[in-house]
Design a protein with these regions (language model features):
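Carbohydrate-active enzymes and regulators
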Residues: 1-276
Length: 276
């Protein structure tokens, strides 16, 4: 368990932009239980949860130069004496978020990942990579961060939209993406960390719902809700509001994910009865 404090001040060049505090711990393996799990506070307020998949805090959508933020971090790692490799670190940086860059990145990533899964002679694969090539050829990366660079990103995004995405929108297929987090109640960390992980994960979901009104989420295992109700009643109250809005689905069908090798038949039946 570690605590970190940092006071950060918005520099003049970030005036008016969306500014994030970006954290890097060196963690890259999602299954590595040494990966730090972090609760982040901004000016004394519980603001975000961080891990290897969530690595930034939004400080301001319209930053003001000279404005100072007090950041506090409570970090946990399951590493213990004799096994910790010393590869984890704690580095904090301020960064400007630019929609031109982020939007283009994800639009290109979607095309690349879809095309890469198809056979080499597949027409959709060929069209996808050709669209990406046209897109990349429009980018002016001679001076990263310059006005010309961001303008070229807009042009590339328009090219990808007009010559690739627009042609595929008439497809009658509709896909609904529903968020979910799988939390093992008895995993490779102590139960108290499972309780904190539930709070961290649900706080992340609530923050995403604040940023994206269309976001929907489903989570099962009523025992997790019991933990959050006991440990973070404020978070639990916000979850209830999202459930009322129809944006958060609290699901069963079992009280928690059981171990079917050890549990008796009666135990499994009780899981289902109380879970539903």
């Amino acid at each position: 368990h570690y605590f970190f404090l940092a006071d950060v001040t918005i520099p003049e060049q970030m005036e008016g932009h969306t500014v994030r505090a970006v954290l890097n711990t060196g963690a890259t393996d999602i299954w590595n239980t040494d990966n730090p799990q972090i609760m982040a506070y901004v000016n004394g307020r519980f603001a975000a949860t961080l891990d290897m998949n969530h690595q930034f805090i939004i400080l301001s959508e319209h930053a003001k130069a000279g404005e100072t933020y007090e950041l506090a971090f409570y970090a946990y790692s399951s590493a213990y004496a004799g096994t910790f490799t010393g590869t984890n670190f704690f580095r904090l940086e301020l960064a400007v978020y630019r929609e031109e860059a982020a939007g283009l990145y994800y639009d290109m990533q979607a095309v690349y990942e879809a095309a890469d899964l198809l056979p080499e002679d597949n027409l959709s694969r060929i069209e996808g990579f050709k669209a990406l090539e046209r897109c990349v050829n429009l980018l002016d990366l001679r001076r990263p961060g310059s006005a010309e660079c961001f303008e070229s990103m807009k042009m590339a995004a328009q090219e990808l939209e007009g010559t690739y995405y627009a042609d595929r929108r008439p497809n009658p297929v509709t896909v609904h993406s529903i968020g979910h987090t799988h939390i093992d109640v008895a995993w490779k960390w102590p139960l108290r960390q499972t309780r904190q992980k539930a709070v961290r994960s649900f706080e992340t979901v609530l923050n995403l719902m604040d940023r994206y009104p269309e976001y929907r989420f489903m989570s099962s295992q009523p025992q997790l809700y019991e933990f959050v109700k006991e440990d973070a009643p404020g978070v639990f109250a916000r979850i209830r509001e999202r459930i009322k809005e129809g944006r958060w689905e609290a699901e069963g069908a079992m009280w928690l994910e059981p171990d079917c090798n050890i549990s008796s038949g009666e135990s499994l039946i009780r899981h289902i009865i109380y879970g539903r």
